[in-house]
Swiss-Prot record, chain A:
It is found in: Cytoplasm; Endoplasmic reticulum. The lineage of its organism: Eukaryota, Fungi, Dikarya, Ascomycota, Taphrinomycotina. Pfam families: ArsA_ATPase. Gene3D superfamilies: P-loop containing nucleotide triphosphate hydrolases. This is ATPase get3. It is an enzyme of class 3 (hydrolase). ATPase required for the post-translational delivery of tail-anchored (TA) proteins to the endoplasmic reticulum. Recognizes and selectively binds the transmembrane domain of TA proteins in the cytosol. This complex then targets to the endoplasmic reticulum by membrane-bound receptors, where the tail-anchored protein is released for insertion. This process is regulated by ATP binding and hydrolysis. ATP binding drives the homodimer towards the closed dimer state, facilitating recognition of newly synthesized TA membrane proteins. ATP hydrolysis is required for insertion.
Curated annotation (Swiss-Prot), chain B:
Keywords: Endoplasmic reticulum, Membrane, Transmembrane, Transmembrane helix, Transport. Pfam families: CHD5 (PF04420). Belongs to the WRB/GET1 family. One of its GO terms (cellular component) is GET complex. Residues 24-107, 170 are cytoplasmic. Residues 1-3, 129-152 are lumenal. GO terms for molecular function: protein-membrane adaptor activity. It comes from Schizosaccharomyces japonicus (strain yFS275 / FY16936). Required for the post-translational delivery of tail-anchored (TA) proteins to the endoplasmic reticulum. Acts as a membrane receptor for soluble get3, which recognizes and selectively binds the transmembrane domain of TA proteins in the cytosol. It is a multi-pass membrane protein. It comes from the Eukaryota. This is Protein get1. The chain crosses the membrane at residues 4-23, 108-128, 153-169.
């Protein structure tokens, strides 16, 4: 099979107008945030409105653009159709729990039910994510780009939507059966239970989780951009991630290889050695992922921070490197 | 006296067999069955296992650092085979459960079943006599259960006593 290698740019993402969700993921320190910001900038040139979301608790978007972002979507200064927000999946679930605690304090039953419900592994992330998705959907953005946490845990719940659904169904079945009993008992004890609200909430979540799932598995709507550097561990992680994504049926056909030394006439001995190593892994990447767009991004001398630097850098995702 | 020793040895043998040999023989018997039964489940299970092992060997021979592409391809193959193998091994273990039960049952009939037949056939025959005046009549009556003459120890009681002693000591 001798196919022409696919063009090494992210232009295919700009051209695919049906795309709604774009995930950018990879190991920590490979330039995920820089890549997702750059991609967002490029997307904003061809789309009506673009939202950039960071689910990384380390919150790098604020650093990258030099503006503080929060849980609400905010326009990035210097852009008219590009907004950003930063969310912390763990914090939002904590908030939700505290809220329901405040609503009905000194209610031992609801606390127990919550403990039971949140014993399902990964449910906190999944619920938080579903919450975010609900919000994002109501905001009506043309395209949403996720800057995922280094481990890619944001996607972990895609692994067990069915488990989750089953567990939730069981739990809600349980309450409908034992709810009256519990109510009676707590009536006798003089406390006031309304554990229904948390389960009603969960039922709602279940719907949105499965809907989100359906959308994520549709390659017309969703794609995942893998970011890596040309080193063994990064490559290894990327391979694992791609296999995982395949098992979740999430489309991925772009790999961004960052921090490459692309100048063939470099003189410093360290650069020559490093370039040699990078070229070795790069050729392996090209051999292994022949059906991917492999975007080679050169290492830039300075930190990519601020709107201007990012805009300049973002060009490298679309136009392949040419030696100056 | 011979009969007494024979029964004791029989009990000892059954005890030792059940404790040390049976599981091994059942497993061996199952392996022989799996090999010669020609059932497609076992065959594909074995094939998969061999493929899995050879892929693993290949994987170990390829340096992930030097030939990442080759290594990753092998790794994908290994993962795929592993999933298939696990699925197949579930099917096989379900099936093997039945076969193993059958083999166990055969062993049971040959050992304990044989003892039962001996006991049943000789239910009227005494094993040895209890010296007169040693035990009260009601105790003698018990020792002769179910059908031996009073004053003698029956096969059933002797078997029971032997089993108790053997299982306590060994």
């Amino acid at each position: 099979m001798s196919l022409e290698p696919l063009p090494g740019t992210l232009e295919n993402l700009l051209e695919q107008t049906s795309l709604k969700w774009i995930f950018v993921g990879g190991k920590g320190g490979v330039g995920k945030t820089t890549t997702s910001c750059s991609l967002a900038i490029q997307m904003s040139k061809v789309r009506k409105s673009v939202l950039l979301i960071s689910t990384d608790p380390a919150h790098n978007l604020s650093d990258a653009f030099g503006t503080k972002f929060g849980k609400e979507a905010r326009l990035i200064p210097g852009f008219e159709n590009l907004s950003a927000m930063e969310i912390d999946p763990n914090a939002s679930i904590q908030e939700m729990l505290e809220q329901s605690e405040q609503q009905n304090p000194n209610n031992p039953m609801s606390g127990m039910m919550q403990d039971l419900a949140f014993a399902i592994p990964g449910i906190d992330e999944a619920l938080a994510f579903a919450e975010v998705m609900k919000e994002v959907k109501s905001m009506n953005f043309d395209c949403v780009i996720f800057d995922t946490a280094p481990t890619g845990h944001t996607l972990r719940f895609l692994n067990f939507p069915t488990v989750l659904e089953k567990a939730l169904a069981k739990l809600s079945g349980l309450t409908s059966r034992f709810g009256p009993l519990i109510n009676q008992m707590s009536g006798m004890l003089g406390t006031n239970t309304n554990q229904e609200d948390i389960f009603a909430k969960m039922e709602g979540m279940r719907g949105s989780i499965s809907e989100v799932n359906k959308q994520f598995k549709n390659p017309d709507l969703t794609t995942f951009v893998c970011v890596c550097i040309s080193e063994f561990l990064s490559l290894y992680e990327t391979e694992r991630m791609i296999q995982e994504l395949t098992s979740y049926e999430i489309d991925t056909h772009n790999i961004v290889v960052n921090q490459l030394l692309l100048d063939p006439d470099t003189k410093c001995p360290q650069c020559i050695a490093r370039r040699k190593m990078q070229q070795k892994y790069l050729s392996q990447i090209e051999e292994l992922y022949e059906d991917f767009h492999i975007v080679k991004v050169p290492q830039v001398p300075s930190e990519v921070r601020g709107t201007e630097a990012l805009t300049k850098f973002s060009d490298l995702l679309i136009h392949p490197y040419v030696k100056e | 006296m011979d009969f007494l020793l024979f029964l004791f040895c029989l009990n000892l043998f059954i005890h030792l067999f059940d404790k040390y040999v049976k599981t091994f023989l059942v497993n061996q018997g199952f392996r022989v069955y799996a090999r010669f039964s020609g059932s497609p489940e076992f065959k594909s299970y074995n094939d998969l296992r061999l493929q899995l092992l050879s892929t693993k060997r290949d994987l170990n021979n390829v340096s992930a650092q030097d030939e990442f592409a080759k290594w990753a391809r092998l790794n994908r193959k290994f993962d795929q085979l592993n999933v298939k193998w696990e699925k197949q091994s579930k099917i096989v273990s379900q099936k093997s459960e039945g076969v193993k039960k059958l083999i166990s049952l055969t062993f049971w009939i040959v050992t304990r079943g044989y003892r039962f037949i001996v006991q049943f056939k000789n239910s009227g025959n005494p094993v040895f006599a209890v010296p007169e005046g040693m035990l009260p009549t009601w105790a003698l009556w018990f020792l002769a259960l179910p059908k031996a003459k009073t004053g003698y120890v029956s096969v059933a009681v002797w078997n029971f006593a032997s089993q108790k002693v053997i299982s306590t000591l060994l």
